[in-house]
């Protein structure tokens, strides 16, 4: 993104070691959660944003944007704060997704 002569490629605002010992990185600028192999550095998958590999199910807003605080919780679901500045109308919310990494689906379980 270009703002007053500055290029903002990545705004990483959370990183977490996932249950399989890989990394979950939240990149706010591109609206993406990126799962990275902790050993090789290879991208395993991308959820959200322009390179999205997932289908969002039961989510009337079809995903998140400008997210913060991405976490994998004990039941295996992913929670995050959806800043929502790209939604119409703009709507911030806390969400929980049930993620099937094999099928590449992300089902909205809770939205507050």
Where are these regions (language model features)?
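Histidine-/acidic-rich catalytic cores in large beta-rich domains
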Residues: 1-112
């Amino acid at each position: 993104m270009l703002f007053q002569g500055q290029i903002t490629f990545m705004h990483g605002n959370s990183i977490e070691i996932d249950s399989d010992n890989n990394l979950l990185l939240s990149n706010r600028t591109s609206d993406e959660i990126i799962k990275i192999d902790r050993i090789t550095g290879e991208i395993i998958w991308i959820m959200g944003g322009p390179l999205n590999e997932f289908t969002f199910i039961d989510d009337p807003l079809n995903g998140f944007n400008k997210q913060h605080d991405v976490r994998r919780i004990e039941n295996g679901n992913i929670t995050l704060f959806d800043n929502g500045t790209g939604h119409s109308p703009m709507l911030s919310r806390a969400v929980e997704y049930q993620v099937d990494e094999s099928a590449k689906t992300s089902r909205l379980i809770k939205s507050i």
